Amino acid sequence: MQTKIFARLAGIGRARFVGTMPDKTKFISKSGTYPQGFSLNGIASGVKANGKKDLAILFSSRPCNAAAVFTKNAFQAAPVQVSRQTLNGCGGKDIHCVVFNSGCANAVTGEGGLMDAQLITAEADNLTRPHWTSWTENSEEFPSSLVMSTGVIGQRLKLDKIQSGLEHAVEDLGSTHEYWMRAAEAICTTDTFPKLVSRELSIAGKVYRIAGFAKGAGMINPNLATLLGLFVTDAPISVDAVRSILRHAINNSFNSISIDGDTSTNDTIAFLANGAAGGSEITKSSPAYKEIRDAVTDIAQQLAKLVVRDGEGATKFVTVQVRGARSEKDAALVASTISNSALVKTAFFGEDANWGRILCAVGYSGAAVNPPATTVSFIPADGTEPLKLLVNGEPQNVDETRASEILSQDELTVDVDLGCGPYAKTNWTCDFSYDYVRINADYRS
């Protein structure tokens, strides 16, 4: 009955508003340039009842320096706890594998869930150890695998399927674009397309490659979200530099997006560097550090934007640009409050230039605001002139036809100038459609 109601509502919405979802297949990577020394696979192990891919493994025969960032949700899933313990124990050194599963979050599953996550890392170590090129004391004392899970909360993993699936996945590891896509597909849940980005850069005559993939479409809010991600490079980067690069990349990408304001129990993004490209170790004081950091950040931003574009039921990609804030904190507060506002997001879906909702969000954000100095504009994606809605606190005679034209496009920018100071922040968000309600109402059915 509920499904019929939601379908009927969705039909009304599509008739009343613009109608069709934007084509998202254009965002799927068709080829790539991938780091040396990594191989991976993604398969259907049977965790998902629909037979889709649900298990992925990435392997480096060379030991990696590694770092990860995790959810701030108090109910941290078993894989989050186990991966954090692994990295703390080994000091971020000698990581060889990352195992992903989708379809079951292994969250709020007690001691049994922790044991399941530990068994998965042990199984990955046992299966790949014959292919390691070097051993250290860490290799003997600590696990060399990280684990990430996503899916329904409160259910135990089908451990027998995971273990059997890992055996099959390791038997057919590969490094071509096809294998990277398999892994990117295997971590998806409500995603409508796999998110994979890669690039190559040359620094002082050395060529390095960086790749990343991520999943996420709902329960997305800064400080990560229902979001799993992995960046890898063949550059020789020190542990401290790996940690610093990851923090910078995340703060300027995944911590600047929102789909629905919810933060998951499982958020994890890791960064591995295996040094297979050779050369001197890159530290935070190395000339190459900033170029590597900026390249990883660029990939992180591309992936973060893909997550927003794939927001559950999303029909619009919205950039929220805040300027003139008194502090960095104020700029971030205003950007995130606008991005999370259900009233703002539903207005975008309805293609309604209701700028009062934007102004309302600015006002309750908790940031320092000077109403007589505040200016709000829509910036079209086609490069034409911005449409001023409010200038120095004064409402403008808005051309509603032009406003509707801007809002009918798949992309737009909301520009807010607070007129209070020099600080700025950019976030990325999407609209709320009827399909968002349908997808989440039917999630477990």
From Swiss-Prot:
Main localization of the protein? mitochondrion
Q: What is its EC number?
A: 2.3.1.35, 2.3.1.1
Q: Which residues form the active site?
A: 226 (nucleophile)
Q: Where is this site: Cleavage?
A: 225-226
Locations listed in the record:
Mitochondrion matrix
Signal peptide positions on this chain: none
Q: In which pathway does it act?
A: Amino-acid biosynthesis; L-arginine biosynthesis; L-ornithine and N-acetyl-L-glutamate from L-glutamate and N(2)-acetyl-L-ornithine (cyclic): step 1/1; Amino-acid biosynthesis; L-arginine biosynthesis; N(2)-acetyl-L-ornithine from L-glutamate: step 1/4
Top-rank taxon, per record: Eukaryota
Query: Which keywords fit this entry according to its UniProt record?
Result: Acyltransferase, Amino-acid biosynthesis, Arginine biosynthesis, Autocatalytic cleavage, Mitochondrion, Multifunctional enzyme, Transferase
Q: Indicate the annotated site residue(s) for Involved in the stabilization of negative charge on the oxyanion by the formation of the oxyanion hole.
A: 150-151
Q: Which GO terms describe its biological process?
A: arginine biosynthetic process via ornithine; glutamate metabolic process; L-arginine biosynthetic process; ornithine biosynthetic process
Question: Would I find Amino-acid biosynthesis among this entry's keywords?
Answer: yes
Matching entries from Pfam families are given as:
ArgJ
Describe its PTM?
The alpha and beta chains are autoproteolytically processed from a single precursor protein within the mitochondrion.
Which NCBIfam families does this chain map to? ArgJ, PRK05388.1
Entry's family note:
Belongs to the ArgJ family.
Q: What is this protein called?
A: Arginine biosynthesis bifunctional protein ArgJ, mitochondrial
UniProt organism field? Schizosaccharomyces pombe (strain 972 / ATCC 24843)
Task: State the taxonomy lineage.
Answer: Eukaryota, Fungi, Dikarya, Ascomycota, Taphrinomycotina
